[in-house]
């Protein structure tokens, strides 16, 4: 939905009051994309620029558009995060430590209180996977617009429940597939639409990573203990847990539950929840979801006829139940199309996102390159005449300088190469998450439908 992606902010648009649920890694990133950063992060970015003038993250953040919003409420079940969220929400001038701050948002202990607060117009959800759909539906039923991080849900039935609630309530809903804002993906959609690759029968996507952080072995935060973490709320509704456990045992999937009882307090499970099916959707819900959405955006594939997966826990022997190696094959017989997905968390070798056509192949990331097939029918004469080379790309699209100067960690580099950190609009570099949040807010103001939700509400789901 290109119209939604490029909605220009209205100068007289109303201020939208935001409530945030979850201030962990992604919650902090979403707040920065919305214009509110931790003062300590500002300090860190300033210092990074002093040490390396090519590191322009601070300048880019300060130049980020004001989205005309106010953070009025925050919720996190870890006290350290909750208090940090309050401070961040008051950082209306983007100040470092010791700066001048604005009114502090109210901290709520439960999401139920936040979504029913009268001074909240819209809710951003950045909690663990197993809470996404529950909080999203509660917010929508309370009449709040919703920005929900991917994945949409923890289970398949919940997906349909969320969709129905969105339809019934009519709230503006945005799912956190910020790749929709990536210029190269939109250019790739045009190229496919113009038939430049010929018939495309095979697509290959890959999400390899090779670092502890990339494998979800996140830091245990100082100050975390049973007194500062609401473990009971993290685990969730006992009836829902029982339903999950009954499903797993009845289908002989006990090996995916893990050796520890879910009621047992665990800092590893709290901070590294992505490693356990009890809370996570694994590689498919964390990484494949971005790749699949990109392919769907580019080729409008919808739901496949079949999907087959295999893999296991082959490298990280740390008690996790979620595989660190996964491969999945998707089939669309009616489209004469197959997509192959592969991932390992123990190798950073990248095989790209490649669309293989009869006449040419296209690789898409934060740049786009098309290489002709040496046996192409469409370009046979041009190949024979030496006009189109077969050993190098004959078309490369670079929307902006292909630089990773301000990318400092393996995980950031991973997302940057996929166009999930930044893109370019009219030559200006933007954080894709910032653009995605901006699109959502402008859809609220202008009565439009966000780019991702238009797919979710379609008959293809």
Locate predicted features.
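N-terminal glycine-/serine-/threonine-rich beta1-alpha1-beta2 phosphate-ribose binding loop
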Residues: 1-145, 160-172
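Solvent-exposed loop/turn segments at secondary-structure junctions
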Residues: 23-27, 77-81, 129-131, 153-155, ...
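Non-transmembrane alpha-helical segments in soluble domains
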Residues: 27, 31, 35, 86, ...
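Generic alpha-helical secondary structure signal
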Residues: 134, 154-157, 161, 432-439
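Short basic (Lys/Arg) and small-residue
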Residues: 150
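Contiguous beta-strand/loop segments that form the cofactor/metal-binding neighborhood of enzyme cores
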Residues: 186-187, 199-208, 212-456
